[in-house]
UniProtKB/Swiss-Prot annotation:
GO terms for biological process: proteolysis. This is Subtilisin-like protease 1. Residues 175-198, 282-312 are annotated as: Disordered. Its EC number is 3.4.21.-. The lineage of its organism: Eukaryota, Fungi, Dikarya, Ascomycota, Pezizomycotina. Gene3D superfamilies: Peptidase S8 propeptide/proteinase inhibitor I9, Peptidase S8/S53 domain. PANTHER family: ALKALINE PROTEASE 1-RELATED, PEPTIDASE S8. Keywords: Glycoprotein, Hydrolase, Protease, Secreted, Serine protease, Signal, Virulence, Zymogen. It comes from the Eukaryota.
Length: 399
């Protein structure tokens, strides 16, 4: 069902006096010996550079002495807005040394984020586009303003995108591969499908918006949190240099265990002016236990079915901002053509696409977009789930 695993965790600090927290994630699938290190907000560039130089020396000393870990060292460096940090493969003694630096905020084990369990059906009616531009279910047309997201750039932080698919009309480009697998394509199909919903000529909402593919999950639909944080970092910097963050949308149809590092990165992207649409997850449980869905500043999206009920798989709870079509959604398939998938993975790009559409039409940006989507939506969802503060289904206001 286009679904992906969301695993709840508890965070326990194990640190020495005056040392940074080393967060424990006992219920998460972790990457062996891989960690994410976040620096405090007041860390200057000079402090950060000094820390990196110290780290290289300390880690080299520890590894030389023990020689227990292969391919060790720093992998990703993060530096945008107030957020500075890095990830890498380190031995236990080096991690303890890192935590003693007073400029370190916390150290977090690197965990696996994933998408999985796709459902493909033939001859399924494409209903999502029609539903978001009509006040009642059952309509057969998508009504929209001809501006159609022009001038807005959408970042697909996902499994990659078939940027040559005919539905993108040359408006999609390859941006970055944080998986570092040397495979700049979408071997999963997930990222191409979500991107088609956002900007495709036939399947999409913002039919004139541009799209940038940011691959953070492998062809098996999974990847480490460290790479996703790097993808967010890359997207923010790319947006700043190409039209500005206030004309940028990011879609994240992914999730996993609660992660302070991932939530912090998502929050910094929003602070920089980007709009973030995030899938709530597909475990029929409280979305508050997963990241980045639990980050308050993003727009967290639950899934609706064709009859305006909450999809049976959709997560619920206080983190939910909106609902959008997510059951049996037809969109682009790598290599050409289309396929049907279900999940909050499919709901989030409806919100991202509509956000791009409204940003072009009304000139709004950032956090104001989620509020505007709530204003335009219809109170249609039945059984929104325990503790869910909204039953609003997105709508474009009838163009």
């Amino acid at each position: 069902m286009g679904v992906f695993r969301f695993i709840s965790i508890s965070l326990a600090a194990v640190s020495a006096a005056n040392a940074a927290q080393i967060l424990s994630m006992p219920h998460a699938q972790t990457v062996p010996n891989s960690y994410i290190v976040m620096m405090k907000d007041d860390t200057s560039d000079d402090d950060f550079n000094h820390h990196q130089s110290w780290l290289q020396s300390t880690h080299t000393h520890n590894i030389t002495r023990r020689a227990t870990i292969q391919n060790a060292g720093m992998r990703h460096k993060y530096n945008f807005s107030k957020m500075k940090g890095y990830s890498g493969i380190f031995d236990e003694e080096t991690i303890k040394d890192i935590a003693k630096d007073p400029k370190v905020m916390f150290v977090e084990p690197d965990t696996i984020i994933s998408v999985h369990g796709k459902v493909e059906q033939s001859n399924v009616p494409s209903w999502g586009l029609a539903r978001i531009s009509n006040p009642q279910p059952g309509a057969g047309s998508y009504i929209y303003d001809s501006s159609a997201g022009e001038g807005i750039t959408v970042y697909s932080v996902d499994t990659g995108v078939d940027v040559n698919h005919e539905d993108f009309e040359g408006r999609a480009i390859w941006g970055s591969n944080q998986v570092n697998d040397g495979d700049d394509r979408d071997g999963s199909g997930h990222g191409t499908h979500t991107s088609g919903t956002m900007v495709g000529k036939e399947f999409g909402i913002a039919k004139k918006a541009k799209l940038v593919a940011v691959k953070v999950l492998g062809n098996d639909g999974s990847g480490p949190t460290s790479g996703i944080v790097a993808g967010i970092n890359w997207s923010v910097e790319h947006a700043r240099q190409n039209g500005g963050t206030k004309k940028a949308v990011m879609n994240m149809s992914l999730g996993g265990s609660s992660s302070s590092a991932l939530n912090r990165a998502a929050a910094q992207a929003v602070e920089q002016g980007m709009f973030l649409s995030v899938a709530a997850g597909n475990d029929n449980q409280d979305a508050q236990s997963s990241s980045p869905a639990s980050e308050p500043s993003v727009c967290t999206v639950g899934s609706s079915a064709e009859d305006d009920s909450r999809s049976s798989f959709s997560n619920w709870g206080p983190a939910i901002d909106l609902f959008a079509p997510g059951s049996n959604i037809i969109s682009a398939r790598p290599g050409g053509g289309s396929q049907s998938m279900s999940g909050t993975s499919m709901a989030a790009p409806h919100v991202a696409g509509l956000a791009a559409y409204l940003m072009a039409l009304e000139g709004i940006s950032g956090g104001a977009v989620c509020d505007r989507l709530k204003e335009l939506g219809t109170s249609s969802i039945t059984d929104a789930g325990p503790g869910t503060p909204t039953n609003v289904l997105i709508n474009n206001g009838g163009a």
